[in-house]
Structures are given as structure tokens and as C-alpha cells.
């Protein structure tokens, strides 16, 4: 059996296992500003769709938002890996997320032969959120009170809307925006939204595509390919996890604790990493499960 044949045969049991299962993929990192990388990811998502998986895409846009802010002479501010969002930043986020990136992904899906529907969390009551309260966070070695501004915590997901789109053969493309119960706009961390949507849809998999190869050790020399919830708690406690990896792991842990079978964090900048993670025995990134089992 040659290498091509062995790759296909290695994929077969996974394709069979994942058939008709729901997978939520969070697109983030450099792919948001590199159309070639984005198209490669979209090709993978369309392939998953055509082998029988129910695919939901949730996209970020952090690098693009930061570039737009810089062009307008505004500096981005982050605390604990979360963007501080004032009114002007919220307007920029809405323009970039729902206006530019969402439309670009839907167009790429169409060019690759599938049907995408671009929606944001504030369409059709898809996501109801509440403003994130002022809270104490560690900034360096100091504990400070932080107001993230127009940033929300997800409270409700209208899963029926997404199920209707999936049943009709569409790939939902979701921008991480939401409304509160009074109709006020809020920005939602894309990792958090993807995790909550995965829980609401009872998804089999949650995938986070980012700029790093997975969850790394403190020295950043080694990837943890398999982690349990207990492992993640230990890494969070000893300071191994920091910056933008914090919300990714928090979303992954929350999803797994609420029934998602496996959460994966991997580099989305290498061609077809998504397929290698899902359809090969060794994978390429980090998989988080409730216990050390193979999925």
C-alpha cells in the first residue's frame, strides 16, 4: 500500500465515526488577514460538509480589527487575552466582522461548491448576551479591576435557527456579535461564542484554529497533544497558559464539561491541518477530552 492509499485508509474510520455529527470550527489568527490561508481552511470545511458532517464556522477578526484601528489612529488594548471594546472599537468590530470577513468566507464557500449563510449573533436572536461585569483580573503581578467595555457574556443561544440552516444543507458562518435583552450591541470573544454554540448544538467536536501549533509547555518547546480537563486545570494554575490561549482553553474546557466529546486547538496557517487533526491517528495539535480516551 503506497502512502496516498494509507492516508485514505487511515481516514476511513474517522469519516465513518464523524458522519452526521456536528462540528463547530472557530477561525482565527493570521488566516483572518491572509485570503490564501483562509481559502485553504474553507476548502477543508467544505470537504467535511461533503463527507457528511454538519459544519458551523465561527470567525474571529482580531488581527483585522487591530489593523483597521491602527489605520484610524487608535490603539488596541487587551487584558487577559480579551479586547477592551469602547464604542468606537465596537463600530470597527461590527464593520470588520459582519461586513468584511463574514462576506469573504461565504463567498469562498460558494467558490468551493457549497452554500454558506453569513449571520451574526444579533441576527434572529441567535445570541443573547449580557455586558461582562467589571471584574478583578491579574495584570502582570497586580490584581486590578477591569471594565472590558462593550463586551458580552453569552446567556442564550437560539440553536433552532442553526439547526434549521444545517438541516437545509447550509454552512452557517457566524460573526461574534450579539445583543443584550434591551437590544444593545455587544462584542463577544469568538472562542467563547464558538464554545457556547458547540454546547447548544450538542456538537461532537469544537475546533479552534489559531497561529500556534497547540497548547505548549512553559518553555514553548513542546506541544501537549492530549490533555484532560484535570491537566488543563493544572496548566492554568501554574501559569503555563497565558494571553490569548486563556479564552481558548476556557471555551474548550466549558464545552467538554457540557458534553462536547473533544475540543481541539491547532495551527490554522498550515495547509489542511484541520484534516490532519481530524482524520489521522496522531493529529497535529492539542486535543482536550474529559478523560484520556481516543476520539
Curated annotation (Swiss-Prot):
PANTHER family: N-ACETYLGLUTAMATE SYNTHASE, N-ACETYLGLUTAMATE SYNTHASE, MITOCHONDRIAL. Pathway: Amino-acid biosynthesis; L-arginine biosynthesis; N(2)-acetyl-L-ornithine from L-glutamate: step 2/4. This is Acetylglutamate kinase. Gene3D superfamilies: Acetylglutamate kinase-like. GO terms for molecular function: acetylglutamate kinase activity; ATP binding. Belongs to the acetylglutamate kinase family. ArgB subfamily. The keyword Amino-acid biosynthesis applies. The keyword Coiled coil does not apply. It holds the Pfam family AA_kinase. Substrate binds at residues 61-62, 83, 187. It comes from the Archaea. Its main location: cytoplasm. It catalyses: N-acetyl-L-glutamate + ATP = N-acetyl-L-glutamyl 5-phosphate + ADP. Transmembrane segments: none annotated. InterPro entries: AceGlu_kinase-like_sf (IPR036393), AcgluKinase_fam (IPR004662), ArgB (IPR037528), Asp/Glu/Uridylate_kinase (IPR001048), Glu/AcGlu_kinase (IPR001057), NAGK-C (IPR041727). The record marks 26, 248 as: Transition state stabilizer. Keywords: Amino-acid biosynthesis, Arginine biosynthesis, ATP-binding, Cytoplasm, Kinase, Nucleotide-binding, Transferase. It is found in: Cytoplasm. GO terms for cellular component: cytoplasm.
